[in-house]
Amino acid sequence: MRHPIATLHMENGADIVIELLPESAPNTVNSFLFAASHGYLDHHAIERIVPGNWVDMSYTAFGHKETQYLIPNEFSLNPEVEPLDSHPGCVCMGGYGEAGLASCEFFFPLRDCPDHKGVYPV
């Protein structure tokens, strides 16, 4: 299966390169690609940093009504998919974990987060 690559160009000149894994979270990857291909992620600042925990790229749907949607938790829809571990160096889709909903928002964990496994698609 093809693994799309997304590159975030930071204002300081650094790049963050993300390999997307559609076999692990097909709907979530499609949601991210939708937002990226329509420019909804362009020129967006980091929304918040929770020291020692994660960096949120958005918790306000990037300010676009087109991204204010929710998709069901990947693992409820696809129970055969083994959830991946959340740890530094990966990207996780944000949303409302306890409600089992996500969107195109995402965050970078700054620590191992075993409590995220099966809640936030990695």
Question: What is each stretch, according to the model?
Answer:
Residues 1-122:
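Cyclophilin-like peptidyl-prolyl cis-trans isomerases
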